[in-house]
Amino acid sequence: MLQFLLGFTLGNVVGMYLAQNYDIPNLAKKLEEIKKDLDAKKKPPSA
């Protein structure tokens, strides 16, 4: 579990670093879509 969290955190940091240094709009959009998908999966549908 700890290893997963470390890898996940490291991945996020590297991703943010790359996004800041290389302005790639498509990649940013893709990351936002993935983030929204993860958030949707985390929360049970309240409808």
Curated annotation (Swiss-Prot):
Keyword hit for Mitochondrion: yes
- Disulfide-bond pairs as recorded: none
Provide the tissue specificity.
Expressed in monocytes and dendritic cells.
Coarse class of the protein's main subcellular location = mitochondrion
User: Any idea which UniProt keywords this protein has?
Assistant: Immunity, Innate immunity, Membrane, Mitochondrion, Mitochondrion inner membrane, Mitochondrion outer membrane, Transmembrane, Transmembrane helix
| GO CC field | mitochondrial inner membrane; mitochondrial intermembrane space; mitochondrial outer membrane; mitochondrion; respiratory chain complex
Q: Which domain of life is it from?
A: Eukaryota
Keyword Mitochondrion, does the record have it? yes
- Cell compartment(s), UniProt: Mitochondrion inner membrane; Mitochondrion outer membrane; Mitochondrion intermembrane space
Q: Which stretches are transmembrane? A: 7-23
Inducing stimuli: Down-regulated by bacterial lipopolysaccharide (LPS) in monocytes and dendritic cells.
Q: Membrane topology per the record?
A: Single-pass membrane protein
Q: Name one GO biological process term.
A: mitochondrial respirasome assembly
In which family does this protein belong, per the annotation?
Answer: Belongs to the STMP1 family.
Q: What function does this protein fulfil?
A: Microprotein involved in mitochondrial respiratory chain complex III (ubiquinol-cytochrome c oxidoreductase) and complex IV (mitochondrial cytochrome c oxidase complex) assembly. Required for the formation of mitochondrial supercomplexes (SCs). Also required for the activation of the NLRP3 inflammasome.
Self-association and partners: Interacts with components of the ubiquinol-cytochrome c oxidoreductase (cytochrome b-c1 complex, complex III, CIII), such as UQCRC1/QCR1, UQCRC2/QCR2 and UQCR10/QCR9. Interacts with components of the cytochrome c oxidase (mitochondrial respiratory chain complex IV) complex, such as MT-CO2.
Q: Give the protein name, as stated in the record.
A: Short transmembrane mitochondrial protein 1
To which species is this protein native? Homo sapiens
